[in-house]
Amino acid sequence: MVKGKKLDETGETKKLSIRGKVNDMYSVYAIPLEYLYYNDQNGRINTAYKKYSSTNGLLSPEPGDSEYNMIFEKFIYESNEKAMKETKQSILDKLQQEPGVVLPDGRVIDGNRRLTALRMIARENNEDRRFNAIILPLYVKSKYDEKIIKELELDLQLGREERVNYDPIDRIFDVYNTIEVEKLMTIDEYLSLIHISEPTRPY
């Protein structure tokens, strides 16, 4: 839980355009890792989580060194070990360069690899590490906000060339889950957010 905590500002700001929000400049905070937890709705690791939950059941999100976070950390690491090692080395060499995005309850919307790298470094070196991130006043229990959160996730993780591409299976599952199961948006809305034209639909 981040809301209500006294957090240090880093002095940085991050520009982020969000539908329905007037302010697009947000202050960056140094957030203790124990306040944060992974996003169980993240499209990149949905297939890994579904496979796990089919045998072990669903997990309840918990911050800090919880079983939930340890399992999701493993999902993130194994989803792309090469990118994970590069992110970890980059943080060791130059600290965290790009702020993440966090919700008031501590859910990390953007920055899974950075969070994982920081958690691993803190654990291996017995160091106090902070996750630099902006805090968006959005709530996953609100259906309206849930759609905005998904739009933001797609824009940050899929709509920019420098991001590591989705695994094809994760992409297909995320499309199906977002459109058919959760009914958060239409196929055209999804495609526009990930910058794919009509002829190359994911399904």
Predicted regions and their residues:
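Residues that form generic nucleotide/phosphate-binding pockets
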Residues: 90, 155-157, 178
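Short, charged amphipathic recognition helices of the HTH superfamily
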Residues: 182-192
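Short, charged/polar connector segments at secondary-structure boundaries
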Residues: 1-129
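Single conserved hydrophobic/aromatic residue that forms the stacking wall/gate
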Residues: 194-203
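Short, amphipathic alpha-helical "recognition" segments used to contact nucleic acids or chromatin
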Residues: 168-184
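Short, flexible helix-coil linker/hinge segments at the edges of structured domains or between repeats
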Residues: 125-173
